[in-house]
Curated annotation (Swiss-Prot):
Inhibited by the sodium/calcium exchanger inhibitor CGP-37157. Strongly inhibited by zinc. The keyword Calcium applies. Coiled coil: none annotated. InterPro entries: CaCA_antiporter, NaCa_Exmemb, NCX_ion-bd_dom_sf. It comes from the Eukaryota. It catalyses: Ca(2+)(in) + 3 Na(+)(out) = Ca(2+)(out) + 3 Na(+)(in); 3 Li(+)(out) + Ca(2+)(in) = 3 Li(+)(in) + Ca(2+)(out). Residues 1-26 form the signal peptide. Belongs to the Ca(2+):cation antiporter (CaCA) (TC 2.A.19) family. SLC24A subfamily. Mitochondrial sodium/calcium antiporter that mediates sodium-dependent calcium efflux from mitochondrion, by mediating the exchange of 3 sodium ions per 1 calcium ion. Plays a central role in mitochondrial calcium homeostasis by mediating mitochondrial calcium extrusion: calcium efflux is essential for mitochondrial function and cell survival, notably in cardiomyocytes. Residues 27-95, 162-168, 227, 347-360, 405-416, 467-491, 547-559 are extracellular. The gene is Slc8b1. This is Mitochondrial sodium/calcium exchanger protein. The modification Phosphoserine is found at residue 258.
Length: 585
């Protein structure tokens, strides 16, 4: 039996040894330092000589604040808060642990903001847009919904690539999330519920992902990403979308011709085509159920507004556990702010989630949020002709538009152009996610300065964990409910979008922004090769072992993946702290 070949416990050990050997040999010809981080720069852009900001911790406590203020390497490109200045200028040295603790709690809350915004506001509006454009489920699943599910990862990558000093976070987070999802999440699914994998979607997705990883590994080896290379990433994703559409069409055509008798639909008898369709919608959120009003019948404008702004469902509140209630309390301020600023269109409801007073109010507030979050509010405070700032003009125009809409519509029936609110909600939620992602990147960089950690290790641990934990819980829940194939398919489908669009679009925007011909990559540490090798080994292991098991995934396979991730983290930490290093020539 081919499946029994993988049962012995030496498989995880073999993977760990292979990871260490791949790390030592793959980077053996590189003249690099043992402890370092990826440095990115755009060719043709003047760069100011500066000291590494992480040197601040080696200075006297009285000199740290002045060093942070004067050193350009300690300044953030975007964001609303200066975290390094807060640590070294506003907190006394003896309260540094308190500052770090507060930053960690704020980081966790930012991850919560990212998750709530993406799940309850960004994804529903993308779904409404795809419905308005009459896209098929497969096209919507690999485009709009993939963008919605990967929004935190994508925006974190775009923000990180925008600053050469934090671009290592992007590579670390995208590769780190890839290792995490293909080992811990995929392995956890098979441990919770062993199942028969869908062969064609699995082979297709893992092949495309391996090509994407190989392209990124090659770019790191060459030390640059050109404009053509960045466009190639995006073109490869377009080719992936076309492949999914064609494969689905061919399969459905063959099925319609060869179908002789009907097959009863059970959770484990889903076809490959149905698996694709369902996995593309795994993370959609039924926001209408939670915010459904308690009162029925004719309601006044004031009642509609109050109920639309209420993020708490009292019926669910009474049945929730203490931990769920505490989490809900933490989310209430975020949900209220998002309900106030982000319109949501629901094509599945009779009224399409039309809330006349709230939607009219959002015509004023949402554009204001757009100009105040774009580039951290730089454009919002710009004065037009030296008379009025942009935000004031936006408020005036929005108020006029809201007044016309309010008096031209009714509470009971949505207007004919109500679907346009989905685009407004999409833009507003996207900029909220971008603003939160900017703060996440800045906090992680500040923690890296304090603990003298490279951006790469922060990206592959904290940033990757934070952005992937929501998808992990969703996939585990699907597996426990009897849909492991759907959850397993979602593991590989989502990370393809993240790496191709994250790297491609991030580098493309950096090239356009800096007016350079390429983005130069300078991996001066062994850690990035550990990361790339680990991801490649995990994919090769799955590509070989899954077909050998005849696509019948067992708990032993899941345990091998989990042990591999543990070995990977151990090797990463040993490399980061210089225990594993290259010998000097």
């Amino acid at each position: 039996m081919a499946g029994r070949w993988l049962d012995p416990l030496w498989a995880p050990g073999f993977l760990c040894v292979a990871l260490i050997l791949e790390t030592a040999s793959g980077a053996g010809d590189l003249s690099t330092k043992a402890h370092g981080h990826i440095q990115f720069s755009a060719r043709g852009v003047n760069q100011t000589a500066m000291a590494d900001c992480r040197a601040v911790c080696s200075l006297n406590t009285s000199d740290r604040c002045d060093f942070v203020k004067r050193n350009p390497d300690c300044h953030s490109e975007g964001g609303y808060l200066d975290y390094l200045k807060g640590i070294f200028c506003y907190f006394p040295p003896n309260l540094l642990p308190l500052a770090i603790t507060l930053y960690v709690f704020w980081l966790l809350y930012l991850f919560l903001i990212l998750g709530v915004t993406a799940a309850k506001f960004f994804c529903p509006n993308l779904s409404a847009i795809s419905t308005s454009l009459k896209l098929s489920h497969n096209v919507a699943g690999v485009t709009f919904l993939a963008f919605g599910n990967g929004a935190p990862d994508i925006f974190s990558a775009l923000v990180a690539f925008s600053d050469p000093r934090t671009a290592g976070l992007a590579i670390g987070a995208l590769f780190g999330a890839g290792v995490l999802v293909t080992t811990v999440v995929a392995g956890g699914i098979t441990i919770l519920r062993p199942f028969m994998a869908a062969s064609r979607p699995f082979l297709r997705d893992i092949t495309f992902y391996m090509v994407a990883v190989f392209l990124t590994f090659t770019a790191l080896y060459l030390g640059r990403i050109t404009l053509v290379w960045a466009l190639g990433y995006l073109g490869l994703y377009v080719f992936y979308v076309v492949t999914v559409i064609i494969c689905t069409w061919v399969y459905q055509r063959q099925r319609s011709r060869s179908l002789v008798h009907s097959i009863s639909e059970t959770p484990e008898l889903l076809t490959d085509s149905e698996e694709d369709q369902m996995s593309s919608n795994t993370n959609s959120y039924d926001y209408g159920e939670e915010y459904r009003p308690l009162l029925l019948g004719e309601e006044t404008t004031g009642q509609i507004l109050l109920q639309a702004l209420n993020p708490l469902d009292y019926r669910k509140w009474r049945t929730q556990s203490i931990s769920c209630k505490l989490l809900k309390v933490a989310k209430l301020p975020v949900e209220f702010l998002l309900l106030l600023t982000v319109p949501v269109v629901d094509p599945d409801k009779d009224d399409r989630n039309w809330k006349r007073p709230l939607n009219c109010l959002q015509l004023v507030i949402s554009p204001l949020v757009l100009v105040l979050t774009l580039q951290s509010g730089v454009y919002g405070i710009y004065e037009i002709g030296g008379l009025l700032p942009v935000w004031a003009v936006v408020v005036i125009v929005g108020t006029a538009l809201a007044s016309v809409t309010f008096f031209a519509t009714s509470n009971s029936e949505p207007p004919r152009l109500h679907w346009l609110f989905a685009f407004l909600g999409f833009l507003t939620s996207a900029l909220w996610i971008n603003a939160a992602a900017t703060e996440v990147v800045n906090i992680l960089r500040s923690l890296g300065v304090v603990f003298r950690l490279s951006n790469t290790v922060l990206g592959l641990t904290l940033l990757a964990w934070g952005n992937s934990i929501g998808d992990a819980f969703s996939d585990f829940t699907l597996a426990r409910q009897g849909y492991p194939r759907m959850a397993f398919s979602a593991c590989f489908g989502g990370i393809i979008f993240n790496i191709l669009v994250g790297v491609g679009l991030g580098c493309l925007l950096q090239i356009v922004r800096s007016h350079a011909s390429e983005v130069k990559l300078e991996p001066d540490g062994l850690l990035v090769w550990v990361l790339a090798s680990a991801l490649g080994l995990s994919l090769v292991f799955s590509l070989v072992s899954v077909p050998l098991q005849c696509f019948q995934l067992s708990k032993a396979y899941g345990l091998c993946l989990l042990l591999f991730y543990i070995c990977f983290i151990v090797v990463v930490l040993l490399t980061e702290f210089g225990v594993i290093h290259l010998k000097a020539d």
